[in-house]
């Protein structure tokens, strides 16, 4: 399973390589409409998060009839093995504000790659016009934010 940390990952790691859908549980966690209780820590509003493969999710309703244990074929296991985490994520507000960010992010990702649509992107990947390259951790660090004392990365307004 691939973990999507931002909208660019959805394009490059999934849709460009042939996926027609993506799982975005962690990305949508923290929205008003997602399950979980709110809490405050160090002045930040957070929302509890249980990844589907976490022990908390597997134990929540017992192992029988539980989507989490079913997904990981653990319904009859007496010992559960975590394949996810529980924690807290920063409050993202309503999904009504977050979905336009995702939509625009998909458009910008396609434009950055030089394609006007997902269909064209997939065609260009298959034909070799768009190719992927491996970047070392050093290259990724070098390509990041440089020469700033501090910065803030906001997903959307």
Swiss-Prot record:
Homology family: Belongs to the IMPDH/GMPR family.
InterPro entries for the chain: Aldolase_TIM (IPR013785), IMP_DH (IPR005990), IMP_DH_GMPRt (IPR001093)
Single GO term (MF): IMP dehydrogenase activity
Name recorded for this polypeptide: Putative inosine-5'-monophosphate dehydrogenase-like protein YAR075W
Organism expressing this protein natively: Saccharomyces cerevisiae (strain ATCC 204508 / S288c) (Baker's yeast)
Gene Ontology BP terms: purine nucleotide biosynthetic process
């Amino acid at each position: 399973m691939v973990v999507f940390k931002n909208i660019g990952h959805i394009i490059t790691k999934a849709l460009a390589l042939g996926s027609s859908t993506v799982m975005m549980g962690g990305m949508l966690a923290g929205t008003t409409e997602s399950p979980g209780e709110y809490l405050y820590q160090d002045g930040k509003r957070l929302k509890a998060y249980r990844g589907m493969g976490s022990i908390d999710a597997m134990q929540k309703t017992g192992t029988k009839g539980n989507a989490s244990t079913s997904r990981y074929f653990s319904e009859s296991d007496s010992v559960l093995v975590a394949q996810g985490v529980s924690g807290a994520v920063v409050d993202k507000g309503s999904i009504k504000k977050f979905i336009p960010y995702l939509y625009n992010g998909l458009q910008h990702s396609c434009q950055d790659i030089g394609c006007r649509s997902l269909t064209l992107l997939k065609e260009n990947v298959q034909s070799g016009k768009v190719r992927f390259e491996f970047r070392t951790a050093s290259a990724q660090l070098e390509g990041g934010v440089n020469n700033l004392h501090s910065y803030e990365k906001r997903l959307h307004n």
